[in-house]
Amino acid sequence: MIHELFKEFSQLEQVEAIALGGSRAGQAYDQNSDYDVYVYLNSPIDEANRLKILSKYCSYMEIGNQFWELEDDCVLNNGIEIELIYRSLESFEQELNSTVFQHQAQNSYTTCMWHNLLHSKILYDPNGHYASLQRTYQIPYPQELKKHIIERQLLLLDQAMPAFSHQIEKAIKRQDLLSMNHRTSEFFASYFDLLFALNEQTHPGEKRMLEYAKTNCTLLPKQFEETIRKYFQLLYQPQQGEQAVVTLQTILKELKAILP
């Protein structure tokens, strides 16, 4: 069934390539794993045409969600969820170039698109454009990019006045739970962006970062997982606020200890 869906999309003139991402692109998936499908376009496909195709294969459809990228979020007739993300191949290429060859660091998730390119499974690529992109970006981690990511994340973590660690300390003192949660999420997004760059690993995205780092990073702070878990155990206990701040400072100290 799923292959027929892919085939119908591949017959549209707007489609230049289709790639499968997420766990389904590798070996770590089971029969219930979702499908993350990236459809690369030279021009938009109108919603009516997408709906016409998807309605044959899906029991539930949300067409045209644009909370992040343009996507259709659906449930296949067999009950498995599928997410179709529509991208301009030209814009995707420009973003990759900006990151990998122009060495532009972001506040977090800097190399996610690069990781997505390298780890996706090609389903349709008649002109070889996507495969060519994979070959172009199958390169050693640029040292200038690594340097820029580390510098930017250190500023965000604790060196700049509005750094996340300072904001967390203020939020803990106020016992502002929502701010504590929000700033902590930003802190660790920045933290892992730095850690993956330090280890010259592309960023796998927001899921299972701790496990991915343990498996793929040779440079890890002392008591890496234990200290992070301790911080979260303390964070939402009002009487443990000071200890949460101390633990956060330990996380920063041990991260800096492994920097070149």
State the predicted function of each range:
Residues 31-33, 95-98, 209:
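Short aromatic-enriched loop/helix-cap "lid" or pocket-rim segments at secondary-structure transitions
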